[in-house]
Amino acid sequence: MKVLWAVLVVTLLAGCRADAEPELEAQEPAVWQSGQPWELALGRLWDYLRWVQTLSDQVQEELLSSQVTQELTLLMEDTMKEVKAYKAELEQELAPMAEDTRARLSKELQAAQARLGADMEEVRNRLAQYRGEVQAMLGQSAEELRARLASHLRKMRKRLLRDAEDLQKRLAVYKAGAREGAERGVSAIRERLASLVEQGRLRSALTSQPLRERAQAWGERLRGRLEEVGGQARDRLDVVREQMEEVRAKVEEQAEAFQARLKGWFEPMVEDMRRQWADLIEKVQVAVGASTPAPSQKP
């Protein structure tokens, strides 16, 4: 009776697996499409778990020899190492991000990373538990143990897929500066990206501007500079002209003063000489008149 019950359970589980497995398999390509190193490593782990889930004779043999858990441990370590490396690379790229935003995103990413690691750890522990149960066989048949393991593996693979997708989304958000909206506090990043886009658009417009327009702009600038220099030269010339007028006025004033002084010096001398000359002429005329004899009268 127990054997029949076990066969019935295995049949039902196999039917459930047949219904659930295509849905799970259909989701796989969307997970690893970008091909990041951590995704490729997780893909190898995923393929290995799919092979383990077949519970073939080889799988059973390797489960009992702990080879499966050892191989799974290596794949887990490789996956987590690639995740950490990719996260470190993103942190370097997003160093200019605001500290509070970067801390919030990093915390969310670490939580998703921890969930993925816990899922893989649970799978490994469950496989180790199965090996112990098979070795003990405490009142259970091998079919029952395999059925229970298959059921657990399906559930854990679904959980692993869900958490892997969540980690992938958060890494994409981290890489894009949290594009999912203001609820993640990334408005500053969007403003910075918008500013960079606007600067790029302006730079592109200036680069594609016709040469004639750019030459005209340079000509306007040069003309303005020449007018400025010419205005400064005219102002300087006016200052020099005013200074020359002041010098000329001073020279004329000094010349007039000197002329007045000369006139004051020589006019008395000239007047005295004129007076002396007039006296001399008068004396000569008197002397000439006195020496001339009077004319004789005839009878």
Curated annotation (Swiss-Prot):
<dbReference type="GO" id="GO:0033700">
    <property type="term" value="P:phospholipid efflux"/>
</dbReference>
<feature type="repeat" description="3">
    <location>
        <begin position="118"/>
        <end position="139"/>
    </location>
</feature>
<feature type="repeat" description="4">
    <location>
        <begin position="140"/>
        <end position="161"/>
    </location>
</feature>
<feature type="repeat" description="2">
    <location>
        <begin position="96"/>
        <end position="117"/>
    </location>
</feature>
<feature type="repeat" description="8">
    <location>
        <begin position="224"/>
        <end position="245"/>
    </location>
</feature>
<feature type="region of interest" description="Lipid-binding and lipoprotein association">
    <location>
        <begin position="204"/>
        <end position="273"/>
    </location>
</feature>
<keyword id="KW-0597">Phosphoprotein</keyword>
<keyword id="KW-0345">HDL</keyword>
<keyword id="KW-0558">Oxidation</keyword>
<keyword id="KW-0358">Heparin-binding</keyword>
<keyword id="KW-0813">Transport</keyword>
<dbReference type="GO" id="GO:0034361">
    <property type="term" value="C:very-low-density lipoprotein particle"/>
</dbReference>
<keyword id="KW-0162">Chylomicron</keyword>
<dbReference type="InterPro" id="IPR050163">
    <property type="entry name" value="Apolipoprotein_A1/A4/E"/>
</dbReference>
<dbReference type="GO" id="GO:0097487">
    <property type="term" value="C:multivesicular body, internal vesicle"/>
</dbReference>
<keyword id="KW-0967">Endosome</keyword>
<keyword id="KW-0445">Lipid transport</keyword>
<comment type="function">
    <text>APOE is an apolipoprotein, a protein associating with lipid particles, that mainly functions in lipoprotein-mediated lipid transport between organs via the plasma and interstitial fluids. APOE is a core component of plasma lipoproteins and is involved in their production, conversion and clearance. Apolipoproteins are amphipathic molecules that interact both with lipids of the lipoprotein particle core and the aqueous environment of the plasma.</text>
</comment>
<feature type="repeat" description="6">
    <location>
        <begin position="184"/>
        <end position="205"/>
    </location>
</feature>
<feature type="binding site">
    <location>
        <begin position="219"/>
        <end position="226"/>
    </location>
    <ligand>
        <name>heparin</name>
    </ligand>
</feature>
<keyword id="KW-0964">Secreted</keyword>
<feature type="region of interest" description="8 X 22 AA approximate tandem repeats">
    <location>
        <begin position="74"/>
        <end position="245"/>
    </location>
</feature>
<comment type="similarity">
    <text>Belongs to the apolipoprotein A1/A4/E family.</text>
</comment>
<dbReference type="GO" id="GO:0042157">
    <property type="term" value="P:lipoprotein metabolic process"/>
</dbReference>
<dbReference type="GO" id="GO:0033344">
    <property type="term" value="P:cholesterol efflux"/>
</dbReference>
<dbReference type="GO" id="GO:0034362">
    <property type="term" value="C:low-density lipoprotein particle"/>
</dbReference>
<feature type="modified residue" description="Phosphoserine">
    <location>
        <position position="141"/>
    </location>
</feature>
<dbReference type="GO" id="GO:0042627">
    <property type="term" value="C:chylomicron"/>
</dbReference>
<keyword id="KW-0732">Signal</keyword>
<feature type="region of interest" description="LDL and other lipoprotein receptors binding">
    <location>
        <begin position="152"/>
        <end position="162"/>
    </location>
</feature>
<keyword id="KW-0850">VLDL</keyword>
<keyword id="KW-0677">Repeat</keyword>
<dbReference type="GO" id="GO:0070062">
    <property type="term" value="C:extracellular exosome"/>
</dbReference>
<keyword id="KW-0446">Lipid-binding</keyword>
<dbReference type="GO" id="GO:0055090">
    <property type="term" value="P:acylglycerol homeostasis"/>
</dbReference>
<dbReference type="GO" id="GO:0008201">
    <property type="term" value="F:heparin binding"/>
</dbReference>
<feature type="signal peptide">
    <location>
        <begin position="1"/>
        <end position="18"/>
    </location>
</feature>
<comment type="subunit">
    <text>Homotetramer. May interact with ABCA1; functionally associated with ABCA1 in the biogenesis of HDLs. May interact with APP/A4 amyloid-beta peptide; the interaction is extremely stable in vitro but its physiological significance is unclear. May interact with MAPT. May interact with MAP2. In the cerebrospinal fluid, interacts with secreted SORL1. Interacts with PMEL; this allows the loading of PMEL luminal fragment on ILVs to induce fibril nucleation.</text>
</comment>
<feature type="repeat" description="5">
    <location>
        <begin position="162"/>
        <end position="183"/>
    </location>
</feature>
<feature type="binding site">
    <location>
        <begin position="156"/>
        <end position="159"/>
    </location>
    <ligand>
        <name>heparin</name>
    </ligand>
</feature>
<feature type="region of interest" description="Specificity for association with VLDL">
    <location>
        <begin position="261"/>
        <end position="273"/>
    </location>
</feature>
<dbReference type="GO" id="GO:0034364">
    <property type="term" value="C:high-density lipoprotein particle"/>
</dbReference>
